[in-house]
Amino acid sequence: VTPEEWHFLTRLDVSGLALLPRGDGGTREGLVQVVPTLMLDGGAEFGVNLEAPVRLRLWGGERYAGVIHQEDWDSLSDWGQVIRALKLGSNEAPLALWMGALDSYSLLSGHLVRRYSNRINPDYHPAGGFLTGTLGPLYVEAFASDVLGARLFGAEAEVDLEHVLFGRSVQAGRYTLAVSAVHEGGRGEGTSPEITLAHLDGTAVVWARSSFELHLLAGWGGRPGTGGAWGAVAGVGADAETPSLNARLRLEARRQHGGFRQGAFGPDYELARFRAAGASRQPLAEAPFPEGASVYAEADVGWDAERLVGRMQRHLSFSWAVEVFTSRRVDTDGRIALQLFERNLELALSVLGVGLGRPGARYLVAGELRWRFASRLYALGRGGTPLFPQTDGSLRPGAQASLGVGVDNAR
């Protein structure tokens, strides 16, 4: 990378933040939030985004609470929030590392870890990471939800069968077999029961063109050491990619038995590890899950009227998943983001619903607005309905809203 290819950005956001209780319990708090940010882009092989969010209490909160909102920095894992993103190595490199906030992360096939976010707990701010490596026909991805804590970690190894049997082919990864395992250590911001899940997957690409691919998939998984806990899956997926469009679609039929389910480490897992959605009031590792079948559908679309650049330049980002169970339960989560008026206005809305249609359903909503009204100045607003884990394992519902301004050297 030549010096001319290096780019940097500095940013400072200052906003007022209100934390409000919903229902019984909790206290009202007013804070000032200051977020300095430094980004350095070294091209495809290197990038880093550092930030140090600090929230200062103006009013409210627990008795004898200090000026600094201590929940933001009360554990070793919370220091991981300084690393928003760190990239070493490109997607094509034989070895690459990524660290930071995991947002809608899936571990390869996604049948164990799917659309997982490690910072959905508002008082827990870890840095996660994943390492990818390629050696001949073998591709491996290993991940950790918290590089500073004994939390969720696992890996998936994928073998290119055509490469093994007939040598390197023009189209790599056409027929693959993969095995994955994920373990919850249960230690971090609070403790939760340990759990280990494993899965075997096979994929076959049945139609491929320069910008389109159609594949079939099937798999089987279980909970090692627990008899009768297993699940099976079969489905179809499609990927399309052009300079202005990137789309991934998936449709699956699933079977659950003995408490096992695909995608157990999903979008609400950092809350479910303390209390799963539903009437059981137990952690996910111990909560019963009804036997039956389900249909799972997922769409992930990015579009730009000019050209897709990285993950940031998109006039439209749309990601949604829904799973409908024979037990009359529905799980869904999604996010839509828009860039309008020459990208001066950015809007985003996220929705999460778990256990819909059954007692103890869980709902989360979050929205964000960013309006650039001058070359280096912008206004920003955020709001949402977070759930705060308590020492007894319960989840206290809350609401938050913030409004502020920021300055950067992006333009």
Stretch-by-stretch model annotation:
Residues 347-349, 366-411:
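Extended, charged low-complexity segments
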Residues 1-25, 35-47:
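N-terminal periplasmic/intermembrane-space "pro-region" immediately following the signal or transit peptide
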Residues 43, 209, 341, 372-374:
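Residue-level recognition of beta-strand termini and adjacent short loop/turns
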Residues 52-54, 92, 101-103, 146:
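A mature extracytoplasmic/lumenal domain signature
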Residues 81-93, 233-241, 368:
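Short aromatic-glycine motifs in intrinsically disordered, low-complexity regions
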Residues 3-9, 16, 27-29, 61, ...:
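Signature for the C-terminal beta-barrel architecture of outer-membrane proteins
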Residues 87-90, 96-107, 126:
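Hydrophobic alpha-helical hairpins/lids featuring a short glycine-rich hinge
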Residues 26-28, 42-85, 112:
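Surface-exposed loop and membrane-interface regions of Gram-negative outer-membrane beta-barrel proteins
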